[in-house]
């Protein structure tokens, strides 16, 4: 969070974090010059064959950027309507037939057939929903 604040203060308008392989929260931060900066700390994995349930849940970020040019020539960029659309990497037994679904297109039946259930039988449709709701602020979360 310290690095995100520094990046905002240095002029970033949007910050998208990566690497931890799991979903992490998103928030607005206020830059030193008063701008609102959107930060998504991690979108998780979009496509992977990881073996742990939380590493199979990710998100796609959508947002609108609005650019304004002031009379003095300075340009400002504002972020509008950021949403994290939850994704699920699905694979069959033996990590075969790997594919990614938006959660809104995923079904409880697919979740029951997920290959990760061999090692983690608690993985399922409700688990995915609850995990996303745990990590992502409802202001930004898009499940439907």
Task: Please give the residue ranges for each predicted region.
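A short C-terminal boundary segment appended to hydrolase-like catalytic domains
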Residues: 56-144
């Amino acid at each position: 969070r310290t690095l995100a604040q520094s990046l905002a203060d240095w002029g970033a308008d949007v910050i998208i974090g990566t690497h931890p392989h799991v979903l992490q929260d998103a928030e607005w931060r206020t830059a030193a010059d008063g701008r609102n900066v959107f930060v998504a700390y991690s979108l998780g994995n979009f496509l992977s064959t990881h073996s742990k349930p939380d590493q199979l849940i990710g998100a796609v970020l959508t947002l609108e950027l609005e650019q304004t040019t002031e009379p003095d020539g300075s340009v400002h960029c504002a972020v509008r309507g950021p949403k994290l659309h939850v994704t699920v990497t699905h694979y069959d037994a033996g990590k075969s037939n790997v594919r990614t679904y938006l959660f809104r297109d995923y079904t409880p039946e697919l979740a029951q057939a997920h290959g990760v259930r061999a090692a983690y039988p608690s993985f399922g449709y409700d688990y995915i929903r609850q995990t996303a709701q745990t990590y992502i602020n409802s202001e930004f979360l898009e499940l439907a």
